[in-house]
Amino acid sequence: MVVRSILLFIVAAVAEIGGAWLVWQGVREQRGLAWIGAGVIALGLYGFVATLQPDAHFGRILAAYGGIFVAGSLLWGMAFDGFRPDRADIVGALVCLAGVGVIMYAPRAH
């Protein structure tokens, strides 16, 4: 279940971060409505993918996903925008990912 959850977080991150990047490109880089439309579709897909997580608690899923979003956004910037994170960016992303692990995968009494 953990592997499935992690894979779903990755798919959600690609959809949300990719969608936001497409909208950014369409508006800020003036690439046009097709880019914006593709971004809106990807953002909608992100919302759907989150519902596939095995945990039933919306707040927990979205809170944990926030950490994935932070780290994924830095990686996306590196891959597609030439961004180079500094030490503080990397440490911050690692703290967020540790938070994801605690929120999603810590043992709980049910």
UniProtKB/Swiss-Prot annotation:
The keyword Oxidoreductase does not apply. Its main location: membrane. InterPro entries: UPF0060. It is a multi-pass membrane protein. It comes from Mycobacterium marinum (strain ATCC BAA-535 / M). Belongs to the UPF0060 family. This is UPF0060 membrane protein MMAR_2961. The keyword Ligase does not apply. Keywords: Cell membrane, Membrane, Transmembrane, Transmembrane helix. The chain crosses the membrane at residues 6-26, 32-52, 61-81, 90-110. It comes from the Bacteria. One of its GO terms (cellular component) is plasma membrane. It is found in: Cell membrane.
